[in-house]
Amino acid sequence: KVLNRIFVILALGAIVFVIGYAVSGMKSGGLLRNRFSFDENKNVKVLNRLNTDWVFPDEYFLEIVEVDGIAMEWIKKKDTESDKVILQLHGGAYTRSLKDNGTTYRRMAVQYAKISGASVLTVDYRVAPKHPYPAALEDALLAYRKLLDLGYLPEHIIIAGDSAGGGLALATCLYLKDHDLPMPAAVITMSPWTNLNYQRRKPAYVGDNRADDPYISPYYGEYGGFPPMLMQAGGDEILLNDTLHVAKKAEEAGVSVQQTVYPGMFHVFQALFPELSEANTAWNEVEEFITFIFSDK
């Protein structure tokens, strides 16, 4: 039952914040309650209100493009052409599309643009079960190559993602490294899902492949040669070890890793900005990291 709840939570990605409740139930030694109403969850209500009340800012414009059949969303500041870009990979357990996630990732894309001064490209990558691995990875790589084709320098690109998108960001960089392709300037992950290797139930994204393939589960990857990484996680989330393990491996491989665990926080709590003070603190950290990465480029 607990494992099933994990998949439900991941599938809803940043839209459902019940991880904190789930972890508290597991830590107490008991199973989750049978009665489990997402609508009654305070964090869900806050996020729904934030998304409903949000108005796209006048100083930015949205452009939806299609690259080889894959939809992507550009967020750019009007009358400004930045040579820096953030490639955002959304969460949702590899089963929820960008459209399924509603306004959440458009809000986050604008937030990335505001704090960085960069343009932001969000990929509506194909999702399981119709499109298992390697579909999402192929689409992330397609977007990255498109940025290079448009003239963006690798050192001017940051790949960012949350939950499944965080794992996908790491998998994308693992692929780039293994194939001697240009690496981005940095990677940012929020509550990344890095280990899909479950004994009892196989995630839909795995398909007929091995779940311990590093391109599916970056938990098993080798991180030597990676760019600087900022990894954030909530202290009370089920996926905490998905961050801690990868951060440790990367640090041992000589990678510059800035890892922050926010006590008492849940899965992808950052999406509750500006309502939640911890979310605002996390975004301030992201801003400082991006400023540092782009400062000499």
Q: Would you name each region that the model predicts?
A:
Residues K1-I15:
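N-terminal Sec-pathway targeting helices
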Residues V18, V23-N41, N48-K297:
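Alpha/beta-hydrolase superfamily serine-hydrolase fold, recognizing
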